[in-house]
Amino acid sequence: MENYSEVRAILERLCGAKGVSGAEDGAANAAAEMLAEYMPVHRSALGSVCGSLEGSGAHILLDAHIDQIGLVVTAIDDDGFLKVAKCGGADIRVLAAAEVTVHGKKDINGVITSTPPHLASASDEGKAKAFDEIAIDIGMKKEAALELVSPGDRVTFDGRFLSMLGSRVSSPSIDDRAGVAAILRCLELLRGREHSCRLSVLFSVQEETGGSGAQTGAFEAAPEQAIATDVSFGSAPDVSSEKYASLGKGTMIGYAPSLDRKMSVRLAAIAKEKGIASQPEVMGGRTGTNCDEIQISGSGVRTALLSIPIRNMHTAAELCDLADI
């Protein structure tokens, strides 16, 4: 079995840093430090991590988003419970009794409240609560909570970086630290080699809340072509095989009206030529990734999408196969 220790170490470090959309500094700082080993780095006005290597050929941008899904505190009620809203597409079905960290004036442990099954009404059995019914218990009364927590503070879901059997790992924020890890590993493989293009890298903020980091970062870089790396749907026992890709069988190459078909075909040809496993991912319109924003940046950018299949997307236990990175 191939040793994936290098990419595993990169991914574990990235997943250990926090960075909910709009408050990405922890994760962005970690990514910037790692990117600085390969190129000059700066942070954009929105906080995206940007870098560039000079070259004489076409200007190509590699993008992956650095933000992760989470929650944002909206209010503190009279009993000291924190009311929250989604920051990105958190899966409400798995939130009951979840352990979280509230990033206030200091990091505070919390648990999302859960109604005991004994007290739930028959009509509510098996149903997820509406978001306005969710609260976080931090073990404090309102006065004490107000000293440490303010509306707007971000909340992350707790979870460990788990090494599974074989080459699979599970962790919060694999979406999209796996894409960031792929680019960093690519740069390591390119170190010391001549390349015939000008290469820019963008670890963009705020993808989970609309893609503003990618749109502004691509405008600043002004590339001729771009490749975004993100995650997509991996195999699951309760989902039709037509709707996902298999874990461990390679990166997904995107085909969509919003993507440049010549680039997608070229990427597939290179993968075949080099013996790199890949899988097609066909979409009928927009991709739901940063490609949608990069494509319309400036006067337009030819864009391709490479996605890593994962399971349990938008939960604290996202799972991927390192072979696909």
Model-derived regions, located:
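N-terminal hydrophobic/helix-forming segments and targeting peptides
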Residues: 1-325
